[in-house]
C-alpha cells in the first residue's frame, strides 16, 4: 500500500510541524515568555515558538469545536423550549509518564482561558484519584501505582459525570508528588467551569482495560475531545531518567519527600535506579495499559528531541 493510500484509509489527518503551524491563522500570542517559563515542566524547554506553532493552532481548533458544541446545546434548548445551563466541555490529555502531559495541560488551560467565549478553565489530574498508599499497601499494589487497578475509578467516573451534569461545587482529591500520596482532606472544588481539562495516564481507557473491576461507564464516555501526547520509547526513557536526576537535586532533598533517601545517591546509582523503575513499572504500564489507548484519541501529538512536537494527527 502506498503512502497516499495509507493516508486515505487512515482515520487520521496527518500534519507535519510546518503544515500544522500554518493553521494558526491570525490567532494572537497571548502568553509572555515569563508566563511560558512558569508553565513548563521540570524537564522541558518550552519556547514561544513551540506555543505559537503547536499550541495556538490547537487552541484555535478547540475553540471551533467548543463553539460548535455550544450551538448544538442551543439547538437542543430551542427544541425543548428550555433555557438550560451551559454544559462544561471536557478535554482529556493522556500519554506516558515523563512525556509532558502536565505542561500540555497547563499551556492549553492558559490559552483557552484567554478566549472570550470560555474564561473559566479548570485543570484536574487523575493522580488524585489513585487509592491512598494505605490502601495500595494493603492490596500489595505499591509497585502498580498508575496501573488501572490502582485507581478509585468509581470516584473518578462520578466526578466527571457530576461535572458533565452541571453539578455545582464538585470536589476532586489532590495528589502530592512530594509525599507520594493523596493529600488527606485536600480536596479541590470545581464549580461549573466552561471547560474542564482532565490530565492523566488513564483518561482514554475503557471497559476492556478494567476486567478486574467491571462497570459500564468510563471517563472516556464523558470526554468531548481527547489528546494523546506521544514520543518514541527511547526518548521517554531518557526523559524519565533526566527528570529523576533533577528531582534528586531538587524535590528529593526536602526531608518531607517520600523519596528523600534518593537524594544521597551518586549520579550513577541514581541512573541505575531510575532505569530500573522505568523498566519494571513505567515502561510496563505504557506497553500494557497506556499505548494501546493511543488510537482512541481525537488528536495525537508526537514529540521528538527536546520535547518539540513534529507531527500532529487529527481524527477525521
Curated annotation (Swiss-Prot):
CDD domains: PanK. ATP binds at residues 95-102. It is found in: Cytoplasm. Its main location: cytoplasm. One of its GO terms (biological process) is coenzyme A biosynthetic process. It is an enzyme of class 2 (transferase). GO terms for cellular component: cytoplasm. Pathway: Cofactor biosynthesis; coenzyme A biosynthesis; CoA from (R)-pantothenate: step 1/5. It catalyses: (R)-pantothenate + ATP = (R)-4'-phosphopantothenate + ADP + H(+). One of its GO terms (molecular function) is ATP binding. The keyword Kinase applies. Its EC number is 2.7.1.33. Pfam families: PRK. Keywords: ATP-binding, Coenzyme A biosynthesis, Cytoplasm, Kinase, Nucleotide-binding, Transferase. Belongs to the prokaryotic pantothenate kinase family. This is Pantothenate kinase.
Amino acid at each position: 500500500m502506498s503512502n497516499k493510500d495509507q493516508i486515505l484509509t487512515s482515520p487520521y489527518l496527518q500534519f507535519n510541524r510546518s503544515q500544522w503551524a500554518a493553521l494558526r491563522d491570525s490567532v494572537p500570542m497571548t502568553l509572555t515568555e515569563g508566563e511560558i517559563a512558569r508553565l513548563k515542566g521540570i524537564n522541558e524547554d518550552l519556547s514561544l515558538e513551540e506555543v505559537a506553532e503547536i499550541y495556538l493552532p490547537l487552541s484555535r481548533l478547540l475553540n471551533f469545536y467548543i463553539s460548535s458544541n455550544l450551538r448544538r446545546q442551543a439547538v437542543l434548548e430551542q427544541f425543548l423550549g428550555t433555557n438550560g445551563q451551559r454544559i462544561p466541555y471536557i478535554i482529556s490529555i493522556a500519554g506516558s509518564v515523563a512525556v509532558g502531559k502536565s505542561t500540555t495541560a497547563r499551556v492549553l488551560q492558559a490559552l483557552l482561558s484567554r478566549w472570550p467565549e470560555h474564561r473559566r478553565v479548570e485543570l484536574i489530574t487523575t493522580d488524585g484519584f489513585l487509592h491512598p498508599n494505605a490502601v495500595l499497601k494493603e492490596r500489595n499494589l505499591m509497585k502498580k501505582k498508575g496501573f488501572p487497578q490502582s485507581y478509585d475509578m468509581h470516584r473518578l467516573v462520578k466526578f466527571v459525570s457530576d461535572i458533565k451534569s452541571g453539578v455545582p461545587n464538585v470536589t476532586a482529591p489532590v495528589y502530592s508528588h512530594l509525599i507520594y500520596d493523596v493529600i488527606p482532606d485536600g480536596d479541590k472544588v470545581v464549580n461549573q467551569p466552561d471547560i474542564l481539562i482532565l490530565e492523566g495516564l488513564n483518561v482514554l481507557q475503557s471497559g476492556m482495560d478494567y476486567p478486574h473491576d467491571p462497570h459500564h461507564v468510563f471517563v472516556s464516555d464523558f470526554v468531548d475531545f481527547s489528546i494523546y501526547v506521544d514520543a518514541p520509547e527511547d526518548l521517554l526513557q531518557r526523559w524519565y531518567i533526566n527528570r529523576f536526576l533533577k528531582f534528586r537535586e531538587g524535590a528529593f532533598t526536602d526531608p518531607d519527600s517520600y523519596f528523600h533517601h534518593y537524594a544521597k545517591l551518586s549520579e550513577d546509582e541514581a541512573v541505575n535506579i531510575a532505569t530500573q523503575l522505568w523498566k519494571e513499572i513505567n515502561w510496563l504500564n505504557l506497553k500494557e495499559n497506556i499505548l494501546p489507548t493511543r488510537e482512541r484519541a481525537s488528536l495525537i501529538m508526537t514529540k521528538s528531541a527536546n520535547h518539540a512536537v513534529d507531527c500532529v494527527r487529527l481524527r477525521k
